Design a protein with these regions (language model features):
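Bacterial Sec-dependent N-terminal signal peptides
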Residues: 1-19
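Mature catalytic domains of secreted/periplasmic carbohydrate-active enzymes
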Residues: 18-362, 367-394, 398-400, 406-421, ...
């Protein structure tokens, strides 16, 4: 790794690591731990894989589910090499087919020819995640187009019992994922979901797991499936104003500066056009460069990245998807070399979220003078979010080797914010905070040169 040995001059009137009062709301311990994960995988693999559709109807024969070479160790091994921290599995999608032998549905792997009806994909993945040091998450669609009780009060108990099975038999769960889709069941009726019951099951059996839906309660949908968060991205949100399937969710997707609850955003996006595997999309896998841009636009905008990898009919991650993930991991590692690291004992550069710089009443400016010009195209900031999210707006002034200045204005920071720009040889830069809920606190400041697979600047 090329190592810079320059000195940094920090010009600011500031207080370092002084204890300050939180600005509420603040994250719980499990929400804080979840934010540190940043990047993990979604595994869409179920009946739809074999029927070549995105949404099944619940009328599919269990005999259709018969992977020829299912290997959860392969999934976990690739995810680990890709730098992911965990995997979330679609245990039951809208068609109702369950990937484990549940006592509460007859539509499951127990009725399939795979392993003569003795298989359990959830068990296999749980063991693989443990082997490779990954966390396990569960996606369990509340909508069920197969179950005869769907559309009645009894179904809520069925769903809760399936939750209990999944939450008590497969080890620690880090995230429980509720899909917002709610359509008709086999009897033509829709279900009124008992969300308080569903939430209570997770809190009872897996208290350290965060729960995802449009409206939380712990983490929320970012509002699109295209792989990006927004320039303004608050973790606080008016949670009591939204609900799963909320029709005016677009009005709340950015979060709110005056939000009442801490519910951080998650970006979900697929490596292919579809969520499930389709053979005609083998040549449409997102490139490593595209994935890196998605990473910056999600993790770099105060959100976590949930990247979907569709498993194919063999029960394996396809070679094209694996190759792209490995390429993404390689250029991400090369790009995330902090050009400011090791140059100061200042809390801004120690890599810890527990220490921070605090702006004074007289000066809200950080200036970094570089003794040697460096090629830079990204500046990253972090707030110590355990004390709340504070910054609502700021601007970065770049000064290149010729003395030419450029000012970039931006919105929120939160857990992590990456400001990208056309590569330039920087002589210095400064950050001015123009809006904040309380005293500005910055725990980390880094600079990068993001590159493409062609070893060229990523941002042109």
């Amino acid at each position: 790794m090329f190592r810079f040995t320059l000195l940094l001059t920090i010009l600011s009137t500031s207080i370092f690591a002084q204890k300050v009062s939180p600005v509420y709301p603040i994250p719980s311990a499990k929400q804080l731990a979840w934010s540190e994960l940043e990047y993990y995988g979604f595994i869409h693999f179920n009946m739809n894989t074999f029927t070549n559709v995105e949404w099944g109807e619940g009328k599919e024969s269990p005999s259709s589910f018969n992977p020829s070479a299912l290997d959860c160790n392969q999934w976990a091994r690739i995810a680990k090499k890709a730098g992911m921290k965990g995997l979330i599995l679609t245990v039951k999608h809208h068609d109702g087919f369950a990937l484990y032998p549940s006592k509460y549905t007859t539509h499951s792997v127990a009725k399939s020819p795979w392993k003569n009806g003795k298989g359990d994909v959830v068990k296999d993945l749980s063991e693989a995640c443990k082997k490779y040091g990954l966390k396990l998450g569960i996606y369990l669609s509340p909508w069920d187009r197969f179950h005869p009780d769907y559309g009645t009060d009894k179904y809520n108990q069925v769903y809760a019992k399936m939750q209990e099975e999944l939450l008590t038999n497969y080890g620690p769960i880090f995230e429980f994922w509720y899909d917002g889709a709610n359509g008709e069941g086999p009897n033509g009726r829709k279900q009124v979901y008992d969300w308080p019951l569903f939430h209570s099951m997770v809190n009872k059996y897996q208290p350290n797991a965060v729960q995802f839906s449009d409206a939380g309660p712990d983490i929320r949908w970012v509002g699109n499936e295209r792989g990006y968060a927004y320039d303004t991205m608050w973790s606080p949100i008016l949670r009591d104003k939204i609900y799963p399937g909320c029709l005016d969710f677009d009005n709340y997707r950015n979060g709110q500066e005056n939000g009442t609850h801490w519910v951080s955003p998650e970006v979900d996006v697929s490596i292919r056009p579809g969520w499930y595997y389709h053979p005609d999309q083998d040549d449409k896998v997102k490139t490593p460069d595209s994935l890196l841009k998605i990473y910056v636009a999600s993790v770099g905008r105060n959100a976590n990245l949930l990247l979907n990898i569709p498993v194919d009919t063999r029960g394996l991650i396809h070679e094209n998807d694996s190759a792209s993930l490995m390429g993404f991991a390689a250029i991400r590692a090369k790009s995330l070399v902090n050009l400011l690291k090791g140059n100061s004992v200042d809390p801004l550069f120690d890599g810890k979220n527990s220490t921070y710089w605090m702006a004074s009443e007289k000066n809200n400016l950080i200036k970094v003078d570089l003794n040697f010009v460096q090629k830079v195209n990204t500046i990253m900031l972090q707030e110590p979010i355990a004390l709340g999210q504070r910054v609502s707006s700021f601007e970065v002034e770049l000064v290149d080797e010729t003395g030419i200045k450029e000012v970039i204005k931006s919105g929120t920071i939160g857990h992590k914010r990456m400001i990208t720009f056309k590569e330039r040889k920087l002589k210095s830069f400064q950050i001015r905070f123009t809006g904040s809920r309380g005293p500005v606190l910055i725990s980390n400041l880094e600079a990068y040169r993001f590159i493409s697979t062609r070893n060229e600047p990523l941002f042109q």
